Each structure stands twice: as structure tokens, then as C-alpha cells.
Amino acid sequence: ALPYSKNIASPKAASEMVKLAMDHFAGIDIVINCAAILRDGLVFKGSPEDWDAVVKNNLSSAYYLTNAATPVMRDQFKETRGDGNNYTWGRIINIGSTAGLYGNFGQANYGSAKAGLFGLTRITAMEMVRSQVTANYVAPFAHSRVTDMIEPANQEQAQYKDRAMRVSPHHVANLVTYLCSDQANDVTGQVFGVRGREVFIFSQPRPVATVASIDANWTPEKLGEAVNVTLRSHFTDLATDLEAFNTDPIV
């Protein structure tokens, strides 16, 4: 293992990290994007500076490293690096958050960055599939330096932090190790969650109901009526991730 102590929230640092790996290991097999910071603040109170810092560290850093590493991984596939057979082994794991999938009070910047990371994961999976490099998103629930940063503003947040502090991150490592193994050769573009000894797969945004009209003069009023009759029952509620996962994890 080689340490790299610079902040990778810059294209230059990401490129330097890739070069360091290439100089010492002559290749890149796995990229795990897990850089994260918190600067919580309500959308009407948060500062633009905090927004920029959180998005840069949680989302842009992942793009910079992926952007720097994927050309190497594509070339490795073309050159059949390894045992001389077709090179079929490349992994990208993006460590996300349920805050980016559900949302959470005071985390407009963090949730937006982690939601963006979901989009980056999907598109990376699509664009790298021909090079047989997989990309997956993992939303962890565990004790980490990020959970240490949480300053609970209410009892619900205090309970969430208390639960997280009791969950070992090795459960997250188990899932990531599986995704980097030969067993997961065809697993890509997926959103996983891991909460102690519980692992789950998330659904992804797809149409669940539709309304249409053969009337060329479809008015907003008629559309509203159709929405109320057909679509309203499919609306998604505003439950936060804290509310969705408010029970004790299996540890």
C-alpha cells in the first residue's frame, strides 16, 4: 500500500495519485471513491462556500479520480493485461449515502453531492461496460470519521448517530470486497446499502405510472385532474433517511 496525503478534490491531485499507482504497481484494478466531508446547513441558511466545499470533496473528487483512472483501465482491457487471456477485471466503487437517495434536513449540499454520485456511477457503468469494468454505488451505515462529524440538532439525529457509532465498518468492507471479486463480474450500475449485517439493493428511478391524452388541446386543468386520479397514489413521501432507517441495525 502507498499513502497519498493530498486533498484529491482537484484534477491535478487525482492525476498524481493515478501516476503514483502506475509507477509502483504498473496498473490500476480497483478505484474506490470514499472522500467525504460534512458542512450541514439548511438550504435557506447554508453558505455558498460550504456548498462548494462539500460538492467538491464528495462529488467532484470522485469524478476527477474516475476521469484519471478510467483511460488506464480501458487500455488494460485492450492490452489484455494479466495472464494473457482477455482482461475482464476492473472495479469502481463509489461510496454514497442514503442522504443522497432519500434526503435529510440540513444536508442540501451533502445530499445533492451524493445524489450526483449516483448519476456518476450509472453513467460510468454504461460507458465502461465495453471494457468490462463495473461501477457500483454503496450507501453505508457505520461508524466513520464522517459520523464523528455529525452534531445532532435533535433527538432523532442523536439516536441515528448513536446507532451508527455501534456499527463496525468491516460490514461495509465485506460488501465492497464482494463487489471487487470475480463473483461480481456482471454486477454493475447497482445501488447497494449496507447496515451492519444487513445488505440491500435499492430500486432506481423508473416510471411507475403514466397519463396521456389524445386531445391536442390538453389544458393544465385537465392534466391536473389526470394527475390526481392516476399519478397521485404513486407519489413518493418526504421521509428522510433517518426516518426510513430508525430501527437498531443487526450488528
Residue ranges and their predicted role:
Residues 66-67, 122:
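A short, exposed helix-loop element centered on a Lys and neighboring polar residues
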